[in-house]
Amino acid sequence: MSGLTVSIRGRNGAFAIEAGFAAEGGVTALFGHSGAGKTTLLKMIAGTLRPENGRIAVGDFTLFDAQKGINLPPEKRRIGYVFQDARLFAYMSVKRNLTYARWAGHRPATRSFDEVVALLGIGHLLDRRPSTLSGGERQRVAIGRALLSDPALLLLDEPLSSLDHARRQEILPFIERLRDESHVPIVYVSHEIDEVARLADQIVLLSAGRVTASGAAADIFPLIDAESEGGGVLLEGIVSAYDERYKLAEIDLGGASFQLSDAGLKQTMHVRLRVRARDVSIARKIPEAISIRNLLPVTVTGIERGEGPNAHVFLDFRGRRLGARLTRRSVDDLGLSVGDQVVALVKAVSVDRAAIREK
């Protein structure tokens, strides 16, 4: 088994969908606004909705092939499905919910019960009923049940959408552990940018039933930012130095570097940085006596002016893309044009803590 390959066309009532992408492993996020076709696509992968033509496969395991007449029923696809609501058996204990999944899978176990329980931190919940669990706990149990069915692929359909912010923060580290330790490809449906930034290895953008872009998270994430105040770019790096006196970490981005204050970082840690366009300003030259630590020499690669007061300036920083959201007045006052060499002032950098990995 390996990654997921999808190339299909079909309909869900009057809604038409045409999707093609390949995901090598890790977490593939299906991202788009409500009604973009994310759940419809997930149903076609799961086998509860039949495409009109095309092919779906996990590695060399074919789930659907219209040309060859293959359309495996859902129970034969080796897919674990986690919904927005946990859908646990209310009359069963947590332990029985989990062991039922193993029985229903009808396959030899590749993961032990204890391994899955430890991975998701649910050992203390085994004797309880679903009605006594918090929303985050129920979703962790639902993920455990899906994992114990020995899936070749996990489909998570907005699993955090019914949870408040605190519960989301509670469960995200467990989904990250699942990504890093289970070795099962995951398709993760969401319209929350923060979740995608934190979890995704690959991103598939959907709009009106069509894939508009797909690829590595760092490459696709800037496309989300063009439409949202909350987006930005993702930069992968390694902590190359740490100043104990000032609690400043230096992040090596492959020839370039960032400085940020974070007492939890240590040398050799791999981290994912998120730089939002709203946190980037532009100057014609390096300012004197300024508190901002990250002053980066960049090249203007594009300017997108909206009808409102703002403009988006696309920047290149040693082969890495950045963006700055400025007012149109600022763009005109600076006289910016494509090809200009300017300085990006990065006012804030966030570290996606789940993306921190010690090597």
Curated annotation (Swiss-Prot):
Keyword Plastid: no
Coiled-coil ranges from the UniProt annotation: none
Membrane topology: Peripheral membrane protein
Subcellular location: Cell inner membrane
Domain of life: Bacteria
Residue sites binding ATP per the record: G32, H33, S34, G35, A36, G37, K38, T39
Pfam families assigned to the protein according to its UniProt record, in alphabetical order: ABC_tran, TOBE
UniProt EC number: 7.3.2.5
GO cellular component, one term: plasma membrane
Catalysed reactions listed for this entry: molybdate(out) + ATP + H2O = molybdate(in) + ADP + phosphate + H(+)
SMART domains in the record: AAA
Principal location: membrane
InterPro entries registered for this protein in UniProt: AAA+_ATPase, ABC_transporter-like_ATP-bd, ABC_transporter-like_CS, Mo/tungstate-bd_C_term_dom, ModC_ABC_ATP-bd, Molybdenum_import_ModC, Mop_domain, P-loop_NTPase
Keyword set, alphabetical order: ATP-binding, Cell inner membrane, Cell membrane, Membrane, Molybdenum, Nucleotide-binding, Translocase, Transport
Protein name as annotated: Molybdenum import ATP-binding protein ModC
Protein source organism: Brucella abortus (strain 2308)
Lineage: Bacteria, Pseudomonadati, Pseudomonadota, Alphaproteobacteria, Hyphomicrobiales
